[in-house]
Amino acid sequence: MAAHKITTTLSIFFLLSSIFRSSDAAGIAIYWGQNGNEGSLASTCATGNYEFVNIAFLSSFGSGQAPVLNLAGHCNPDNNGCAFLSDEINSCKSQNVKVLLSIGGGAGSYSLSSADDAKQVANFIWNSYLGGQSDSRPLGAAVLDGVDFDIESGSGQFWDVLAQELKNFGQVILSAAPQCPIPDAHLDAAIKTGLFDSVWVQFYNNPPCMFADNADNLLSSWNQWTAFPTSKLYMGLPAAREAAPSGGFIPADVLISQVLPTIKASSNYGGVMLWSKAFDNGYSDSIKGSIG
């Protein structure tokens, strides 16, 4: 009996150790949704390459605007045209892939006019995409794991309020995708709240802090970002040269040899974010074995 108890205790210990190791493991986040030729959401998750998939984008919201989900050529959310994605979201979740709704984007029309406006947007997102209830759920009944803030226009006001309101619902993963120059023009105050579980910094299309012939500026900027309060910090990169017209692409072999060894030493290193699935033609395959 004593031996049985010891064996059981050890089994539980190793199981819990495995769970904690896997939850702390580094991974790859990818954006999906802005190119109808990039494959389905289900097939994206089935690659086994990604820890997070960000569905992009809720491109219009706030300041009295009707919210608009823009999934490019994948589907039209009008008349429940994207509800079929519910099964694909659940398929992703069954494979331990976290699926987030990315709000904003580079070409959206969005802003928050007040703290009350931020609260209304939070309620809309919760009821339409997360654990709440609404007659209109553009992605069907599936419950997304959280919200990604890809805020690239407008002011920096009230995004911290939106983050807090979403966190108040409980069990909502929050991520942010700031540009690499510090401070970020839109998300600086929000990120400094410490509410974001993951921050994947866009180290591309920004010459002062991206890879260009060498990694000096990139790694200097990374070191500054490690001081921000987030559980996991990711290096955001283009998945192909054409994904970032203003630069920042790092060949896979260079990333593995010149960049990852340094950033993996950071205590809050979380992995790599890629823009986007449409451009990921083998890049994630090449780097995934070196991310952790």
UniProtKB/Swiss-Prot annotation:
State the superkingdom: Eukaryota
- Gene Ontology terms: biological process: chitin catabolic process; polysaccharide catabolic process
**What compartments host this protein?**
Secreted, Extracellular space
What is the annotated signal peptide range for this record? 1-25
Domain GH18, chain residue ranges per copy: 26-292
Its annotated function is as follows: This protein functions as a defense against chitin containing fungal pathogens.
Q: Which SUPFAM superfamilies match?
A: (Trans)glycosidases
Q: What is this protein called?
A: Acidic endochitinase
Q: What induces it?
A: By salicylate and upon tobacco necrosis virus infection.
Give the species.
Cucumis sativus (Cucumber)
Asked if Transferase is a keyword of the record, the answer is no
Q: Where is the active site?
A: E152 (proton donor)
**Which E.C. number(s) belong to this protein?**
3.2.1.14
Q: Which family does it belong to?
A: Belongs to the glycosyl hydrolase 18 family. Chitinase class II subfamily.
Q: Which CDD domains match?
A: GH18_hevamine_XipI_class_III
InterPro entries for the chain: Cts1-like (IPR045321), Glyco_hydro18_cat (IPR001223), Glyco_hydro_18_chit_AS (IPR001579), Glycoside_hydrolase_SF (IPR017853), Glycosyl_Hydrlase18_Chitinase (IPR050542)
One GO molecular function term? Answer: endochitinase activity
Any single Gene Ontology cellular-component annotation: extracellular region
What is catalyzed by this enzyme? Answer: Random endo-hydrolysis of N-acetyl-beta-D-glucosaminide (1->4)-beta-linkages in chitin and chitodextrins
Query: Which keywords has UniProt assigned to this entry?
Result: Carbohydrate metabolism, Chitin degradation, Disulfide bond, Glycosidase, Hydrolase, Polysaccharide degradation, Secreted, Signal
